[in-house]
Amino acid sequence: SGSCEVKTCWKAMPPFRKVGNVLKEKFDGATEVEQRKIGSTKVLVPKNSQFKPHTDEDLVYLDSSPDFCDHDLKNGVLGTSGRHCNKTSKAIDGCELMCCGRGFHTDEVEVVERCSCKF
């Protein structure tokens, strides 16, 4: 009949939140590895022999992250001591997380400001 059908396909990313959740899950289960030479081939094996070998889908790392809680100029880490935090927040600005479980001091401050109130 002379008619034809066109089908177009493309790949699309899942919602950003879903990608973030998958990456966080992989990060939490990441395995520290070391490089070993087996014959003429270099392979990555778990640093702890009690861990199972990783798959192509697993997240692995060679070097541990620095401790961002403590002052370490060699690694460019300023630490968290003396920073202001949000006492009620459970996010990264929250005192429990930012202060690395070391505790924190609270100050109550009263701020008096002029406002453009009309009565």
From Swiss-Prot:
It is found in: Secreted, Extracellular space, Extracellular matrix. GO terms for cellular component: extracellular space. Keywords: Developmental protein, Disulfide bond, Extracellular matrix, Glycoprotein, Lipoprotein, Secreted, Wnt signaling pathway. GO terms for molecular function: cytokine activity; frizzled binding. Its main location: secreted. Palmitoleoylation is required for efficient binding to frizzled receptors. Depalmitoleoylation leads to Wnt signaling pathway inhibition. Belongs to the Wnt family. This is Protein Wnt-4. It comes from Plestiodon skiltonianus. The lineage of its organism: Eukaryota, Metazoa, Chordata, Craniata, Vertebrata. The gene is WNT-4.
